[in-house]
């Protein structure tokens, strides 16, 4: 039996009793003495006594018709009354918004303090992606909004980095560090907690590990992703560099060159230095269509050897343009690669020490240090983020059956300054199942819209937690609208003065924002608003890091805990120089020395 039919039968089953009762009344009317209606009604009581003397139902046709008709009429009355019933919601006539309390957040908190994401002083979210009750499952993506000085680092970033000792849910961190101060403050704690610490510094290249995106190219699609990230986050300066045709042509050029380097160059030449040299060696002449640059000759020889080569196919499409067009493309390409003319940048990206593909294998903290005033080198960070997410997703799928053994938390402070991560709106919707999460930290939601346009709303919708630390204007209005309205009681007192004085009292209900725009704009600096999907919002105290059990290991508590990045990198490189790889080969020479020669050597 279908569920709908079963539900219908159960709902109408009680009306069989009314079929019986109305049938008995029909039987009483039929058995009453008299030949017309008035006489029947006069003796109806006698008929009832006879009819109800026997409890068995009557199967007389007249009695059955009366029973069915009476029950049907009653069912129709109930149906009509239900349809036209007035709907009252007492106390919530204008809105049911309210602040959440301890009982609201309790199902989402892990009993073990270390197994939680710290959101406020009283609210936390378990790191468990598969809780016993699936209804309480939430992704670990957090959107943090707070203006300058609202404590985004102190009240959110640092408390969550101090959650680095969980044994049930080991976690790696990828942290953007504007100004480079955070690594010095928390680095010592991470080291003593068993973390590998990696650092990419785009402010001071001498205090950075090396990053080479070519080391993470494993297929043609990886080449396309790298080119796309480079195009999205750098600017060509040719007169037509912003036009779609020119960008597509430039994309073909980069794809061909990077594809050539990836598949044909020796390992030590797989870097941006080689790419820059190939661009510098490229040339197109409008007055000499037969002219061939050194790069043209390289691709011609490659085509003779392998006509179906990926790089050759891309370069042939690039050559379809006229000489003047190619000259414009080369100018734009040279301008886009201008940052690599700086020797320090080339040296930074000639080798790789970050080991991005292993961050989900063991506990690692990767600090991405960037300037908060200059975005010149932020395209490097965008490349790191883009490659990292794609590498971890592929590694989770190919090696670990879809889930990384170590959860990777990306805490992206000043997210708007990183640059655009291609397809981030799609990636953030799929990384949860791979044990990856992102905490997006902004000064205003308009920053997200400025970079990701229409995709900004998709990104924010995929964050199950929103933490609002402070804000004014449009930010405050958006938060106020999302919080909704509550129903309040209004009491008015009036007085009319004339020949006679009269007084009046008026009670009514009104709708009021749970927190108005001006209340949000003037919110106490120690307070914050937290929204968790499917839960009432919370108006709580910001997290006090001095009460965290591991606060004593930060340099905030004791200057002796300051982490010296320079010394750390120097020690790592010395250690690396002393280690001989098992794969390293040596030449062995067998020399036959005489006794006299041996004596001379010993002396």
Predicted regions and their residues:
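Conserved long hydrophobic alpha-helices within structured protein cores
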Residues: 113, 119, 379-386, 479
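Conserved ATP-driven motor cores of ASCE-family P-loop NTPases powering translocation/secretion/packaging/pilus
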Residues: 428-529
């Amino acid at each position: 039996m279908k569920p709908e039919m079963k539900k219908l039968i159960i709902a109408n089953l009680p009306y069989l009793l009314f079929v019986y009762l109305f049938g008995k009344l029909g039987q009483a009317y039929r058995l009453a003495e008299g030949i017309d209606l008035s006489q029947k009604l006069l003796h109806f009581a006698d008929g009832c006594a006879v009819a109800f003397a026997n409890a068995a139902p009557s199967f007389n046709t007249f009695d059955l018709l009366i029973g069915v008709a009476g029950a049907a009429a009653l069912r129709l009355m109930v149906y009509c009354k239900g349809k036209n019933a007035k709907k009252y919601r007492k106390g919530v006539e204008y809105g049911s918004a309210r602040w959440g309390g301890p009982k609201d957040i309790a199902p989402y908190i892990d009993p073990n303090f270390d197994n939680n994401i710290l959101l406020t002083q009283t609210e936390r979210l378990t790191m468990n992606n598969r809780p016993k009750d699936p209804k309480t499952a939430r992704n670990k993506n957090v959107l943090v909004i707070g203006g300058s000085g609202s404590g985004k680092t102190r009240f959110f970033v640092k408390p969550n980095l101090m959650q680095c000792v969980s044994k049930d849910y080991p976690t790696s961190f990828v942290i953007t560090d504007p100004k480079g101060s955070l690594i010095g403050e928390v680095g010592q704690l991470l080291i003593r907690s068993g973390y590998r610490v990696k650092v990419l510094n785009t402010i001071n290249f001498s205090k950075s590990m090396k990053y080479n995106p070519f080391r993470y190219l494993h297929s043609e699609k990886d080449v396309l992703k790298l080119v796309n990230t480079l195009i999205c986050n750098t600017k060509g300066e040719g007169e037509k560099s912003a036009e779609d045709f020119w960008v597509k042509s430039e994309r073909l050029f980069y794809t061909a060159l990077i594809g050539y380097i990836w598949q044909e160059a020796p390992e030590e030449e797989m870097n941006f230095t080689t790419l820059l040299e190939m661009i510098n060696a490229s040339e197109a002449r409008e007055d000499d269509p037969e002219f061939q640059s050194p790069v043209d000759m390289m691709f011609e020889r490659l085509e003779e050897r392998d006509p179906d080569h990926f790089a050759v196919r891309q370069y042939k499409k690039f050559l379809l343009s006229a000489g003047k067009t190619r000259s414009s493309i080369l100018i734009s390409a040279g301008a886009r690669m201008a940052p690599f003319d700086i020797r320090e940048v080339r040296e930074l990206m000639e080798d790789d020490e970050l080991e991005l593909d292993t961050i989900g294998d063991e506990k690692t903290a990767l600090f991405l240090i960037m300037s908060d005033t200059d975005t010149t080198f932020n395209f490097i960070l965008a490349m790191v983020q883009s490659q990292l997410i794609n590498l971890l997703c592929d590694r989770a799928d190919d090696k670990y059956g879809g889930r990384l053994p170590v959860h990777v938390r990306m805490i992206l402070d000043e997210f708007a300054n990183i640059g655009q991560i291609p397809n981030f709106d799609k990636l953030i919707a799929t990384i949860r199942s791979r044990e990856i999460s992102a905490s997006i930290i902004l000064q205003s939601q308009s920053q997200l819209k400025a970079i990701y346009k229409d995709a900004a709303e998709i990104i924010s919708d995929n964050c199950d937690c929103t933490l609002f630390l402070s804000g004014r204007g449009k930010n405050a209005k958006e938060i106020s609208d999302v919080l909704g309205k509550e129903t309040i009681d209004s009491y008015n007192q009036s007085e009319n003065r004339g020949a006679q004085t009269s007084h009046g009292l008026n009670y009514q209900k009104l709708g009021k924002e749970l927190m108005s725009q001006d209340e949000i704009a003037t919110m106490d600096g120690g307070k914050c608003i937290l929204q968790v999907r499917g839960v009432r919002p919370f108006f709580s105290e910001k997290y006090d890091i001095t009460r965290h059990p591991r606060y004593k290991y930060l340099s905030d508590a004791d200057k002796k805990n300051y982490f010296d990045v320079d010394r750390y990198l120097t020690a790592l490189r010395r250690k690396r120089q002393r280690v001989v790889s098992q794969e390293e080969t040596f030449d062995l020479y067998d020399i036959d020395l005489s006794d006299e020669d041996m004596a001379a050597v010993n002396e």
